Design a protein with these regions (language model features):
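N-proximal low-complexity "stem/linker" segments adjacent to membrane-targeting elements
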Residues: 1-28
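A conserved acidic beta->alpha catalytic loop
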Residues: 26, 41-50
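Short beta-strand/loop segment that forms part of the nucleotide-sugar
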Residues: 34-43, 63-68, 92-93
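Glycine-rich, basic loop-to-helix element that forms the pyrophosphate-binding segment
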Residues: 67-83, 96
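Short aromatic/hydrophobic "clamp" motif used to bind/position activated sugar donors
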Residues: 88
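Donor-binding/catalytic cores of nucleotide-activated saccharide
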Residues: 96-211, 215, 227-233
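Membrane-interface aromatic/basic loop that binds lipid-linked glycans or pyrophosphate carriers
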Residues: 114, 252, 281-346
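Catalytic core of nucleotide-sugar-dependent glycosyltransferases
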Residues: 220-229, 234-262, 273, 277-305
Length: 346
């Protein structure tokens, strides 16, 4: 019988002692047994490292590496350098997957000779679960359709703007199965979050999708993404500068690869939508200071230029009102709508 292809499951771990056993149990109990589980303890200050060691001693498929804290991108890059499987899967240390995930993903990849397999996920809050729909049914993607997936990593276009809250639903690296050879051949890696703030997954996928010829989507909710509501907001001083680096990297990629006008428009839309994140970040301040921060964001040249070209026709009323305030440079309106969003989020 032909040997089944190995899946290398990469698990970055940082201070998740409370959830780590659930994650690891979901991996060691996969119905598809030909897996290696590569865990990188990114300088955890809790008992995460000890838990990893316990699992590593009891299951030969688990490799554990303890490193000084350098962030999730560094941890994933390190783990990737040790991977030997045909396929790569990422699972964060506080999340978990269904026990049939590897089996279903590998079957789909082999069935369609897919360079990428994707599936939706469930956001797991302390008191409820919320499925995140990506596509409504099973799909395969070829050539031009894979290019559209890549463009989605830059930003939304057209009717996609009807749901700005889903801008990055497709962009995670968990909920996907990758070909290790494709990653290695093209030297694809994760960017340091100290430089770009967030969205290391999206940049990874942007570069990976440039080389994907066939992709497949399974409509089963196989991944579980833990969301802890009620967390205290903390102001991220460097976020605006980091996102400028992110946008600059995207723009450089678009120009270098001659991606086209649709990628440019998608980036402008991403820059506009990022006002939401920057505004929510500002709400960590008292009201007067938060309002001053929001005025500063709205007056920035890059945001003024992007918001000027943002199409409004597809937005539902609440988003239309928010971006109308942005276009009008009406900081007080933006502030009040952000406060409403913050309350709704929890």
């Amino acid at each position: 019988m032909e040997q089944t292809p190995m899946v290398s499951i990469i698990v970055p771990v940082y201070n998740v002692e409370r959830y780590l056993r659930q994650c690891l149990d979901s991996l060691v109990n996969q119905t598809y047994q030909n897996v290696e589980i590569i865990c990188v303890d990114d300088g955890s200050a809790d008992s995460s490292g000890e838990i990893l060691n316990q699992y590593g001693e009891s299951d030969a498929r688990i490799s554990v590496f303890h490193v000084e804290n350098a962030g999730v991108s560094s941890a994933r890059n390190k783990a990737l350098s040790y991977a030997s499987g045909k396929y790569i899967m990422y699972v964060d240390g506080d999340d978990w997957i269904d026990v049939c995930t590897c089996e279903k993903a590998v079957f789909k990849a082999e069935e369609h000779a897919a360079d990428l397999v994707m599936w939706p996920y469930i956001r797991e809050f302390p008191d409820h679960s919320a499925p995140k729909v990506i596509f409504s049914e099973e799909k395969t993607f070829h050539a031009a359709e894979c290019r559209e997936l890549q463009r989605r990593m830059i930003g939304l276009l057209g009717t996609e703007l009807a749901h700005p809250e889903n801008a990055d639903a497709l962009c995670t690296v968990w909920g996907k199965l990758y070909l290790r050879e494709l990653i290695a051949q093209n030297d694809i890696h994760f960017t340091d979050l100290q430089r770009i703030g967030t969205y290391e997954d999206g940049l990874f996928n942007l570069h990976y999708l440039a080389h994907v010829k066939n992709a497949a989507y399974i409509p089963d909710y196989l991944s579980h993404y833990r969301k802890n509501s009620g967390m205290t907001s903390k102001y991220r001083k460097e976020l605006a500068a980091q996102w400028k680096n992110l946008f600059s990297d995207m723009r450089s990629y678009i120009e270098l690869e001659k991606c086209g006008d649709d990628f440019d428009a998608a980036l402008n839309n991403r820059i506009s939508l990022s006002i939401i994140g920057l505004g929510l970040n500002a709400l960590a301040f008292p009201s007067r200071e938060a309002l001053r921060e929001i005025r500063g964001i709205l007056s920035e040249k890059e945001y003024r230029a992007a918001i000027k070209t943002l199409p409004m026709r597809y937005f539902p009323l609440h988003w239309w009102a928010f971006f109308a305030c942005c276009k009008l440079n009406f900081a007080s309106g933006v502030f009040l709508l952000l406060k409403c969003m913050e309350r709704i989020k929890g």
